[in-house]
């Protein structure tokens, strides 16, 4: 027989239990709380949707908190195989004579490398590495947002860059992130907020390009919910429960 406890009280207790361990199994939670597996899974789903926990195989853990953005150099060494596969899928979605936006990041840099031989595209970016690569190696037309420079990220941030984006219309924006979960995209850098929010307003289609290692992380500032996106391109390491919830949001999901 289940213990009588309202959902909010039970979820608070569940959070306290999870916070004391790096990972706790569903079976342990069932025994401690004295409720059914279904009840525990329902509570975990609610907490995951609220951006507080992440489901793992047979259990649950707290989200990993991202206190600062990794540098461009650090990110360039991570998940290289996944980024290449993601970028190849992204390029398949770019129609001829499109205006596209490449957000600052190493996954979007891989997209830039994939489109270098195309002369029918206008590429807008706030990333200096992407702009330089395309300037030297590509046939694309290129525009840079300008604005305050984030040296470690090698990109422009802040209101000036955002104001540039207010004056354009983009067919597809490829958006990057270092932390996301079922609640949405987050950032530890307040100066990135204006650019991130501007591009999603002035693009006809918004596509998140991210490898699964960034899922289950959270930072201080919420940028926007996943439901604001049209498409997510990720690798096959994305947890199955996350795949199911994304489908329920009517967000297109490609796993490569």
Curated annotation (Swiss-Prot):
Gene Ontology molecular function, alphabetical: cis-regulatory region sequence-specific DNA binding; ligand-modulated transcription factor activity
Signal sequence coordinates: none
Keywords, sorted A to Z: DNA-binding, Transcription, Transcription regulation
Annotated SMART domains: DeoRC, HTH_DEOR
Domain HTH deoR-type: 7-62
InterPro entries, A to Z: Carb_Metab_HTH_regulators, DeoR-like_C, DeoR_HTH, NagB/RpiA_transferase-like, Tscrpt_reg_HTH_DeoR_CS, WH-like_DNA-bd_sf, WH_DNA-bd_sf
Nucleotide-binding in keyword set: no
GO biological process: regulation of DNA-templated transcription
SUPFAM superfamilies, per the entry: NagB/RpiA/CoA transferase-like, Winged helix' DNA-binding domain
DNA-binding region listed in the record: 24-43
Protein name: Uncharacterized HTH-type transcriptional regulator HI_1009
Organism: Haemophilus influenzae (strain ATCC 51907 / DSM 11121 / KW20 / Rd)
